[in-house]
Amino acid sequence: MKKIAVDAMGGDNAPQAIVEGVNQALADFSDIEIQLYGDEAKIKTYLKANDRVSIIHTDEKINSDDEPVKAIRKKKQASMVLGAQAVKDGKADAVLSAGNTGALLAAGLLVVGRIKNIDRPGLMSSLPTIDGKGFNMLDLGANAENTAHHLHQYAILGSFYAKNVRGVAHPRIGLLNNGTETTKGDPLRKETFALLAADETLNFIGNVEARDLMNSVADVVVTDGFTGNAVLKSIEGTALGIMEQLKTSIKQAGLRAKLGALLLKNSLYDLKDSLDYSGAGGAVLFGLKAPVVKCHGSSDAKSVYYTIKQIRIMLETDVVGQLVEEFSNRGD
């Protein structure tokens, strides 16, 4: 049985969206147990009876404006901290939260702990592509600054995830750069390129540009945390902007446009689905001793459900256990 600790109080729509997502996951997956951390009375309002779910009551939670490290150290009984502690103590196999991102990163590092020989765990997410296959990208903001050695490790981490969780046999690794030529980039990008090209265990395809990411140019894209976070928010904003612009144009263009939209309804739904990344799950703080997964702060029940599904696959494939062995053998 796979045991997943869930911070029921984190996120804009907690606890309703969190608990409703848990309800659906419990109904669909008979091999998981859920531990809900938070206000018991509020949780019970939305929770369906199930013998594979338990509530660990706490009145304390970490707020969105709390300073991350200070909150983790001072709010020992916060729902997020208790979930991470359950993983450390072996009472849970993974932890999920839609709460304060910085605090969850701190909890992952300070409570759960990183895998030996991994210098800087990276925040990784699955992002949408036009063909619907998606790609993984890291780091998405766990670290403001990175070295070439960190980015090399991210390529290994991302490749492992793509193989074991997404089922990509030979993941194509791309280095995000300002051009595809081998001579492009600043010193960080050039040094990283050399390390990736020299690693025969990776299917490194070279530099990739941001404009090509949604065209499935690579299965895993590696970059520093600052750049990755900016790209992530650009993709999110573009996807939302396209859909809003379509809605506005149809509404303002009159009857003909509305009739045309009706005829194109299935195609428009396909477009919406191709830009919707909620079905891909959450962002993984990869490189820790157990899965620590972050849902978007505005996650609905669907997103929570798919994040639990994602964690279940990670536990089923033992991707973290394989990483521990891999980096133990590398010793770098």
Swiss-Prot record:
Biological processes, Gene Ontology terms: fatty acid biosynthetic process; phospholipid biosynthetic process
Disulfide bond residue pairs: none
Location (main, coarse): cytoplasm
Catalytic reaction equation(s): a fatty acyl-[ACP] + phosphate = an acyl phosphate + holo-[ACP]
GO terms, molecular function: phosphate:acyl-[acyl carrier protein] acyltransferase activity
Keywords tagged on the record: Cytoplasm, Lipid biosynthesis, Lipid metabolism, Phospholipid biosynthesis, Phospholipid metabolism, Transferase
Source domain of life: Bacteria
Pathway noted in the entry: Lipid metabolism; phospholipid metabolism
EC number: 2.3.1.274
Entry's localization field: Cytoplasm
Cellular component aspect of the GO annotation: cytoplasm
Protein family per UniProt: Belongs to the PlsX family.
Subunit comment: Homodimer. Probably interacts with PlsY.
General function of this protein: Catalyzes the reversible formation of acyl-phosphate (acyl-PO(4)) from acyl-[acyl-carrier-protein] (acyl-ACP). This enzyme utilizes acyl-ACP as fatty acyl donor, but not acyl-CoA.
Name by which UniProt lists this protein: Phosphate acyltransferase
Organism: Streptococcus mutans serotype c (strain ATCC 700610 / UA159)
